[in-house]
Amino acid sequence: GIKTLDGFDWSWPKKINRALLQQVFRLDFLPQHGNVILLGGVGVGKTHLAIALAHTACLQGKTTLFTSAVDNVNALAAAQATGGIKREMARLLKPSLLVVDELGYLPIDKFGADVLFQGISQRYERGSTVITTNRAFKHWPEIFHNDSTLTSALLDRLLHHAESIVIEGPCYRMRDQSDA
């Protein structure tokens, strides 16, 4: 089924700022081109909430694009190889809301770090971005090819108008596993 905020199991996360999350779902950040970072371990509901945010934006008539960080980088790499990088970058810049899922789950090479930086930089104050990640900000240089200068610049733009929501708890998908 469609992921919604109503379908989110609030009893599962050990820690989540429910009031802030509900405020974010009013989408007041979209007209201001703000961003949302959903930060937490594996299986705590980040992707569910990101999909639900995108769905809510669609219901309000906003253009939305959902992609994983790796798919995003791969699409840009393929576009670079065929001379279509400007067109692919434009596709990422066009929607009111861009959701980048799973940033930090897999390492990104220098090209990937550079193009992700370009995309987020170009969206700065022009469009909203939601990012799900399992990495604390202090570990983001590891995502971006250990380029601390690029990472600092990226975080500066991303966090300037952003709400960061930390979700803590065990993996929801493992809730039915016994301790046998």
Please annotate each region the language model reported.
Residues 1-3, 31, 160:
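A generic structural signal for short, non-catalytic loop/turn and secondary-structure boundary residues
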Residues 1-19:
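Charged, amphipathic alpha-helical linker segments immediately N-terminal to NTP-binding catalytic cores
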Residues 16-94, 143:
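Conserved P-loop
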Residues 12, 40, 169:
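Flexible glycine-/small-residue-rich
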